[in-house]
Amino acid sequence: MFWVLVLLSFIVLIGDGMISEGAGLRPRYVDVGAIFSLGTLQGEVTNIAMKAAEEDVNSDPSFLGGSKLRITTYDAKRNGFLTIMGALQFMETDAVAIIGPQTSIMAHVLSHLANELSVPMLSFTALDPSLSALQFPFFVQTAPSDLFLMRAIAEMISYYGWSEVIALYNDDDNSRNGITALGDELEGRRCKISYKAVLPLDVVITSPREIINELVKIQGMESRVIIVNTFPKTGKKIFEEAQKLGMMEKGYVWIATTWLTSLLDSVNPLPAKTAESLRGVLTLRIHTPNSKKKKDFVARWNKLSNGTVGLNVYGLYAYDTVWIIARAVKRLLDSRANISFSSDPKLTSMKGGGSLNLGALSIFDQGSQFLDYIVNTNMTGVTGQIQFLPDRSMIQPSYDIINVVDDGFRQIGYWSNHSGLSIIPPESLYKKLSNRSSSNQHLNNVTWPGGTSETPRGWVFPNNGRRLRIGVPDRASFKEFVSRLDGSNKVQGYAIDVFEAAVKLISYPVPHEFVLFGDGLKNPNFNEFVNNVTIGVFDAVVGDIAIVTKRTRIVDFTQPYIESGLVVVAPVTKLNDTPWAFLRPFTPPMWAVTAAFFLIVGSVIWILEHRINDEFRGPPRKQIVTILWFSFSTMFFSHRENTVSTLGRAVLLIWLFVVLIITSSYTASLTSILTVQQLNSPIRGVDTLISSSGRVGFQVGSYAENYMIDELNIARSRLVPLGSPKEYAAALQNGTVAAIVDERPYVDLFLSEFCGFAIRGQEFTRSGWGFAFPRDSPLAIDMSTAILGLSETGQLQKIHDKWLSRSNCSNLNGSVSDEDSEQLKLRSFWGLFLVCGISCFIALFIYFFKIVRDFFRHGKYDEEATVPSPESSRSKSLQTFLAYFDEKEDESKRRMKRKRNDDLSLKPSRPI
């Protein structure tokens, strides 16, 4: 019996050894390190969440096949050195992964260690956009990178129409690189960071006065949109000091990054002082869908935290990060790979290390395989779908946009990389096509600082007491637009009145002073004038400034306050106005022939209708009136007499067509004569100007000179500079130039005084005049809105009429004779008259042939009554024919029929 017991004991020992050796493939514990500052808000929340995840993973022994996940948290105590020591400690204890570090500064340092020892490092708080997978392949961000956070903020700024922002941030990698990313995103939207206020890392402890100093600087600046990218403790202090300085009032815009939402979620309620200082602030939170998993975890939180701290989004990502590691461990163990570590030859070969035990740092042999399992994770966690893109960024990054209000905070919308700004949850939009158009971007109403719901302008004039220097051209001609008052530096004119009226419509004061540019002896060069805005000589320039492409590249223009464009002016003559102007369209022969045909056609119709139409019968006087009335009423197609004969209708139809052509031509010609001036120059527009060899005048200082040389390829030798309207007129009259090219407003003013000239052809450029401001100047936008307001209310037109609506033109440089005018001549219509005449002749021929035939057939009965002499016989026949012609056809037929019957009754009857 004793030996049996010994044998059984030996078998058990052997079995235990075999089991232990086999179980080596699945270790009892898989170690994971975590490095956080547990005294911080993030550290406290993430530590609780990681422990909960560890318990959930280990609650199912089958998940890791009997192995357990063991997470050891190292408290870095906000100290960089301790953070490094914690990482080294985990590398010595064979940790397969490290969760952390908490800050991007340490992530940059420790990522080199992770790369060397092949230990994956996962962080959901170190979200620096510069931590790339190419540089640090073993560093994985398990929450959306701050690159997307800055993209969301940039789209918000663009959505509200702000062009400049101020960045206030701590001098650390995460904050600094985040602001750099923001600057890049803003630049693509024509916005910019106008000032960067950098605060030391420990500013609250070591130099709190530095916060006040920076806020005072910001207070005196132009921009009122401030981005705060810092830590919760620093951020709280910033807003408290800003409130004391009156910077949480109407007009300011404050946007805080995700640090504020973590504070709002975890500390509830906030201290009254802090809550009051945050009213009206916008902030963002990483979006996590409201899934059942999330709701269940939120419900557990109070029990997990014992009510000491609220759950924020970093707690959710901490929980999911543990599960990412656990699933990767499961896949590694399921692949039957041993979890093993080996010495790093680079470290073991180091000599003179003193007491440093660098040889204890070992390489994770399966690190690359384990990393591959991590980045290929595809799971649904409490934060939603977890999946990495090829560049290691999280799939479908999105944010909640939060507005801090009196009773806490409220959500005003979302941002997602898929669809931009929306009031619909991003997960509802992922199945739709991406639409990033401005019309598809929406957010709900915001309560801004100061309690206002009106979107702040985002900028004010700098509070430095300096007035804006507004450049004004000191013109030598066309002073209706801009001119210096005699004996002073004051200015007046159309452009000045428009500017002053627009300034009055702006809802804030615009202190300014006008500064003259030029000597007043000749017009200044406007390209140089505009360039002075770029180099800072002027804060803006006002005047008759054409908006052209070259200038828009260096300055921003307002909405045009007057339309403009280049036109060609050439000499003309004009017909003298007379009471008989209505006779000008036709030459005298044309009038005579037209009048004759009215009478001829009327007579022909009377002849054709006289015997059969009662309306063309009656006493001679009535018939003459009928002929005249019918003839001339056809001019207006208002004749009331009906034609019943076929021939009459045919003639009338042809005549009405002729009348239609004549009246239409008359109307068009009269309109042209009364409204269009007549040329005595071969220049008919820009095309003939280019092809001609004549000299061309232009206004000194105008862009027309460069345009003709560069765009129209007109030789510089053909161009003649002119300085005033009088020089224009003299040059055109004496033939110095064949034409002048200038902008339309100048030309209109010139023609109102000198009427012997006219615009030839159409405007061959389209532009306008505006006021120029520095690039991205918010004042340019407000001035444009004000100019539109002036236009809509009619005030802009009143200013125009005050300065430009005048006409002193009384002397004419010539007149146009009948031969030179565009009168309608007979040769243009002889074909119509010929057709009408032939039709009348044919109709009369047919008619007389028919009536003569009928007369000789029936009229002989009248002649048989007497046998006169030959002379009297011819006279009697003519009288009989005329009587027959004048007799109504029906009566003639009845008379002839009656006479025939009488003749038959007088013949003797034949005997029976």
Swiss-Prot record:
Transmembrane residue ranges: 588-608, 618-638, 650-670, 829-849
Cytoplasmic membrane side: 609-617, 639-649, 850-912
Glycosylation sites: N306, N338, N378, N417, N435, N445, N532, N734, N808, N813
Protein residues bound to L-methionine: D544, I545, A546, R551, Y703, E743, R744, P745, Y746
Topology in the lipid bilayer: Multi-pass membrane protein
Protein name: Glutamate receptor 3.2
Name of the gene encoding the protein in the UniProt record: GLR3.2
Consequences of knocking out this gene: Overproduction and aberrant placement of lateral root primordia.
One Gene Ontology cellular component: plasma membrane
Comment field (misc): Overexpression of the gene leads to calcium deficiency and hypersensitivity to potassium and sodium.
InterPro entries named in the record: ANF_lig-bd_rcpt (IPR001828), GABAb_receptor_plant_PBP1 (IPR044440), Ionotropic_Glu_rcpt (IPR015683), Iontro_rcpt_C (IPR001320), Iontropic_Glu_rcpt_pln (IPR017103), Peripla_BP_I (IPR028082), Solute-binding_3/MltF_N (IPR001638)
